[in-house]
Amino acid sequence: MSDKILWPGSWLFHLSFFFVIVRHLRYFLEPVPDCVTALQPFGVFAGYVLLLALASVLCMRLFSGKKRYVSYSNYFILSLILLISLSGILMRNFFRPNLLQVKAFSLGILTFSPETLPSGNLFIFHFLLALLLVPYIPSHIFAAPLVLLDAARREKGLGMMMHEK
């Protein structure tokens, strides 16, 4: 039963994550392409869907009988993205940073001429968590087949992988 709920939650997560990333491109591109501008409303909606999808995937991971498939690394990245998503929604609705400062700061980083860091502790928290996520995603993607092989090995009772001894 959990797989029937986990798969749609996972797809919703990945699709909404994509739209949120596309929405954030407006802070890193000047001029902003029309396709990015056209997708802005979807990105806003996707931010809320992302939070709900993350919560559902995390709950299914926590309460599913297939805990052997979930590593601490999975919990770490889910929690990290959940915190990034939550802080982003809080900034969108309650603690709005100055978006002109955010864009100037982002473009300054990309052009190696940094601007002043926008004020607001929540933005700094959100930004630092995103910086932590960026290098983690490629290693998470490349390690995914090994995690699945490890889970299958444990399911068959073949013991631990060599790195866990």
Each language-model region and where it sits:
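Long, contiguous internal "core" modules enriched in hydrophobic/ aromatic residues
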Residues: 1-107, 115-125, 133-143, 147-160
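Terminal, Lys/Arg-rich, intrinsically disordered segments and adjacent short helical elements
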Residues: 163-165
